[in-house]
């Protein structure tokens, strides 16, 4: 952050400041976030987000009018959204690796048209809060949420097309 602040005195070019932020600051804020993100409290999440908010204020300078508007202008996501996207991407990549296949066991009844069982992956059950907030159950829940979203999108698509699936992309 100090480097970003110093550079902001020499240049007002937002792309240069964004490059410094993305390469020097954001990487430190997100390092190994797929492991520790699920265990964050709301206060810790706000503290981490506060760092990005300060960086965005430095980058925007006098044109800063609010955090959400600045994120849209700079085409940035909140750090929480980025951590969720990275965790989902990590979980999907892990499904393809044989050594991680046991972390995400499939339900026996899970196939595309099953409506009785809403979850595709078995979420490990535990009585301890520490395990419930750890990475593996969090990633399992994240995969289930993504699976349900895809299933709803497919159902909506089939309803729109009256059950006929077209090869042409929908615009």
Question: What spans do the regions from the language model cover?
Answer:
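Hydrophobic/basic alpha-helical segments
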Residues: 1-171
């Amino acid at each position: 952050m100090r480097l970003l602040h110093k550079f902001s005195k020499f240049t007002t070019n937002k792309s240069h400041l964004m490059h410094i932020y993305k390469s020097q600051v954001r990487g430190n804020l997100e390092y190994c976030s797929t492991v520790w993100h699920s265990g964050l409290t709301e206060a810790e999440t706000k503290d981490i987000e506060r760092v990005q908010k300060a960086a965005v204020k430095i980058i925007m300078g006098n044109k800063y009018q609010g955090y959400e508007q600045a994120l849209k202008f700079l085409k940035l996501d909140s750090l929480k959204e980025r951590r969720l996207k990275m965790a989902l991407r990590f979980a999907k990549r892990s499904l393809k690796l044989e050594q991680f296949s046991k972390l995400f066991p499939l339900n026996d009844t899970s196939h595309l048209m099953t409506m009785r069982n809403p979850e595709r992956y078995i979420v490990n059950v535990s009585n301890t809060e520490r395990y419930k907030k750890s990475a593996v159950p969090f990633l399992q829940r994240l995969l289930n949420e993504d699976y349900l979203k895809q299933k709803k999108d497919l159902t909506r698509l089939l309803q729109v097309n009256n059950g006929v699936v077209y090869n042409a992309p929908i615009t």
